[in-house]
């Protein structure tokens, strides 16, 4: 199969995927991934997505999410490339098992079963369905690849008809975003929610997006002003930190507006500050509290808004210290404090532990 002639654009996309894991896995695993890519390419050859592009770009995108955004290993990357092969081609599960092993075949089988259940899941309540997905799978890779699959489908949803887009977006909101949350995949959860809102409430989505854009410079200046004394003191105390200011997600702002029946201007915490300390695991808890003390020396905290997930992590593994303080000009600001290890878990979810 190594003599296979693959179009330049597809090959370029595959090479981009390889760069995300090339220094993390051995030569044998790389060969296996190449074999799974070539198998998927032949299985989907000539098939196009609704957007008109070759179907193989979808499994390539899913594999890249799995490797780069979730941080999984070679088995998951291989299965992400093959995830639609049994469902959409003549290739049988036995063939997958023979070529790629029992573990890979079980994951592909799990992914195929989930697709079948979703097709007939109209009457199943979202919460029951989420529980069923979690218990259905002996291997967490199945759920994580399914989330990556849904994320790519949401990113490319624009090519579908409006009714179909709304249906998929609603399903994403009630099933997949909470599932990502349950597994601690906060970045993926947030993106799924924002993309779902874009198709379920497009007017609200674009209104909030536009206003966030319009207030970008003002927000950046405020964050700079807020952080100035903190940065000086943190450095003086000898902490090595990275500090980021980021706007809250469009979905979370919309949720607050709806719940409190207020407009965009009245949402008091439209952004959050994240302080990540480069501490050794032995000192990370005390360092986070010391940084908390520095922040609250400058800005008065709201005691009702303190969340200590360092002493008691969330069930999905999330660890962080959250506080809301009164910043300059009487604005409330949310501050999240965590170590690099905690941040890795917050970004990659429980996958950071398991795989």
Regions found by a protein language model. Give the residues of each.
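N-terminal glycine-rich anion-binding loops that anchor highly charged ligand groups
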Residues: 31-38
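Generic alpha-helical structural context detector
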Residues: 38, 64, 106-109
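Hydrophobic or amphipathic alpha-helical targeting/insertion segments
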Residues: 81-88, 93-110, 185
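Aromatic/histidine-rich interaction motifs
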Residues: 113
């Amino acid at each position: 199969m190594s003599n296979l002639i693959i179009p330049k654009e597809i090959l370029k996309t595959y090479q981009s995927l390889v760069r995300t894991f090339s220094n993390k896995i051995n030569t044998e695993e790389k060969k296996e991934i190449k074999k799974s890519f070539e198998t998927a390419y032949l299985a989907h050859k000539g098939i196009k997505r609704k957007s008109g592009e070759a179907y193989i770009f979808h499994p390539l995108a899913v594999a890249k999410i799995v490797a780069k955004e979730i941080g999984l290993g070679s088995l998951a990357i291989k299965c992400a490339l093959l995830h639609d092969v049994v469902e959409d081609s003549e290739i049988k599960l036995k063939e997958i098992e023979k070529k790629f092993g029992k573990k890979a075949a079980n994951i592909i089988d799990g992914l195929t079963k989930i697709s079948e259940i979703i097709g007939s899941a109209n009457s199943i309540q979202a919460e029951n369905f989420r529980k069923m997905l979690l218990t259905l799978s002996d291997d967490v890779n199945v759920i994580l690849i399914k989330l990556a699959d849904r994320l790519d489908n949401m990113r490319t949803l624009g090519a579908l008809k409006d009714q179909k887009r709304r249906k998929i977006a609603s399903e994403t909101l009630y099933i997949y975003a909470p599932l990502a949350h349950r597994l601690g995949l906060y970045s993926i959860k947030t993106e799924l929610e924002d993309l779902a809102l874009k198709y379920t409430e497009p007017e609200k989505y674009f209104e909030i997006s536009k206003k966030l854009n319009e207030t970008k410079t003002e927000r950046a200046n405020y964050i700079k002003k807020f952080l100035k004394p903190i940065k000086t003191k943190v450095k003086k105390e000898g902490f090595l930190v990275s500090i980021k200011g980021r706007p809250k997600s469009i979905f979370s702002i919309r949720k607050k507006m709806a719940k409190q029946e207020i407009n965009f201007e009245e949402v008091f915490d439209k952004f959050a500050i994240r302080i990540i300390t480069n501490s050794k695991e032995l000192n990370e808890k005390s360092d986070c509290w010391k940084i908390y003390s520095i922040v609250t020396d400058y800005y008065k905290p709201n005691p009702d808004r303190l969340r200590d997930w360092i002493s008691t992590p969330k069930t999905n593994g999330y660890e962080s210290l959250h506080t809301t303080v009164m910043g300059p000009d009487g604005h409330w600001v949310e501050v999240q404090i965590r170590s690099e290890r905690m941040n890795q878990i917050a970004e990659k979810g429980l996958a950071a532990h398991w795989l």
